[in-house]
Amino acid sequence: MNLETQFDKVLYRHDEVRAQLSSGEGMDSQTIQRLSKELSELDPVVTAVQAFRKAREDMVQAAEMMNDPDMKDLAEEEFYALKERLPALEREVQIMLLPKDEADEKNAIIEVRAGTGGEEAALFAAELFRMYERYAGLHGWRFEVMDVNDTGIGGVKEASATITGRNVFARLKFESGVHRVQRVPATESQGRIHTSAATVAIMPEAEEVDIQLNDSDLRFDVYRSQGSGGQSVNTTDSAVRVTHIPTGLAVACQQEKSQHKNKATALKLLRARLYERERSAKDAERAAARKSQVGSGDRSERIRTYNFPQGRVTDHRINMTLYKIDAVMSGDALDELVEALVAADQAERLAEME
């Protein structure tokens, strides 16, 4: 389908939805809500299409006016200005017309795990977790810790949280993968640089309508919460492990003192993992991408390197380096990487459509 046909389809659908909402005949509140949402999504696309077509028409008129000696200079100036602007307007519309990822508007669940590198990897995992917490705060998103398995000396073996806000998953989904750190640990007396790794997994938060869990498919185990070093930190069996029998996926949670709250959190995390598994199964390309990004936490598989002695952060997927590691770790400069990754993804998908 060529671009002009796509434009016409969008304009036709926009008029159709607007007419349906205006009449409102025989529509229940759910239908009205669905159509209103569709109209709000179509509005900016229609505006962009109209701006592109208007600029193109103005350019044709300017070209015709260049034949008039009295208008030649002014017409030439307008013609070349529009000619320069037109590709950007066209690209803007093309990006808007790219197929949407159904999960982009969802909230996200983040899991950070220490990989290779022992205690240094656990310390780095904790720093990454805090980086995303600060980044969420800068965007006005809500960051709610689900579970933390800490080492007792500042590191985390594993930590998870729910991030709630507008287009959270769309912004964060490219953070999934192995993050490598190179620096001199505080305990290193010889000043040698060590390499460690942590994995980040970003999953869309799944609702019950996305993944339905049958009680018969679940096994619940309760036990006492364990603190750092393995000592019990609770006198009741408040920690919960839930296993999805058909897939073997298991999730444990011990963050809260309430067994009921830990169970709810574990189910939420399990549902997200199952939803992500289902999404990957439906899309072979996405499954391959996730496998190469998330990996096993081994230092040989990496999407990004944080080199503290050089003060740089390098994203290997797009060959982008920022010499502002402190600003990235504080969340302030993370948007520069996120924006570049989103743009690279859009460029790839546009190239596939051509």
Swiss-Prot record:
GO terms for molecular function: translation release factor activity, codon specific. Residues 283-308 are annotated as: Disordered. The modification N5-methylglutamine is found at residue 231. It is found in: Cytoplasm. Its main location: cytoplasm. GO terms for cellular component: cytoplasm. It comes from the Bacteria. The keyword Kinase does not apply. InterPro entries: PCRF, Pep_chain_release_fac_I, Pep_chain_release_fac_I_sf, Prokaryotic/Mito_RF, RF-1. Methylated by PrmC. Methylation increases the termination efficiency of RF1. Keywords: Cytoplasm, Methylation, Protein biosynthesis. It holds the Pfam family PCRF. PROSITE patterns: RF_PROK_I. HAMAP family: Rel_fac_1. Belongs to the prokaryotic/mitochondrial release factor family. Peptide chain release factor 1 directs the termination of translation in response to the peptide chain termination codons UAG and UAA. This is Peptide chain release factor 1.
